[in-house]
């Protein structure tokens, strides 16, 4: 859990009974892609949206971005309708596929998106320098992005989604195509942004990433949310207990087994812990870097871009209030805000 605020923070995403039905040419309902979705994401949270292909995740994201209109239900993004133009300036979005202009360089790509957000030349230059360092693409910033590997394209896409210093970040498969080093760096970046007050909606098929990062998780299937809660709530197995100690001699293990047996509690497993393959991989790569080994790809990412450091305070000052600070429990959506939108 990496959020900067508790469950009492402002509500940045609120959905109540959201449904989307796609119709044919004759307006007959054909596919109900999203069916009665209700969820709430509070400021500073990392919220995981999971589900197999065709479960309704992408359709839900498009409705949150205002690209699709819901057939039924209500949505509020940063306290406004998803179609509110001013609110879109406070949102960063990384789609599942990297849609880039192949003949622009990495620097030109970021400059283009900075111009779309009407950043002045000095702000663009400073932010681009910091973002390129942050995602490890300084050395290849003048190469056309069409020559980038998929992992490098995801890095420039992530930098693009941050150029406007968003309050809400929607990331669809951000680590797709990345090696374990790049994946670890992106996960660390997401955690840091959340601690600085950014709100992150994360979609990923890499369940380990979601478990590492997310404060709350929703699992979709058939257009509906089938389970929702914290990872601890969803994953804790109440029927088993783990005891951890230093290396235990065989004689002590036998004594422990006898004690447990007297209480009708069989000892089902005794083993030495294993490190993860990811940690071994990262250790080997870091060792090679320390020895001066070179790579032709993306380099190790740098510090978080300085202009993002004020995310919690800066965005809070410019973003509309999304809900009362103490509104409801984490699992119950504050419908007052949505009701007010309906009346407008």
Q: Where do the PLM segments sit?
A:
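A short, flexible loop at the N-terminus of ABC-type nucleotide-binding domains that lies
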Residues: 2-15, 21-36
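Conserved ABC transporter NBD signature motif
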Residues: 73-87
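Conserved ABC ATPase "signature" region
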Residues: 111, 115, 123-140
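Conserved catalytic motifs of ABC-family nucleotide-binding domains
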Residues: 165
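Catalytic Walker B motif of ABC-type/P-loop ATPase nucleotide-binding domains
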Residues: 169-173
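Short, charged/small-residue-rich alpha-helical element at the C-terminal edge
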Residues: 231-298
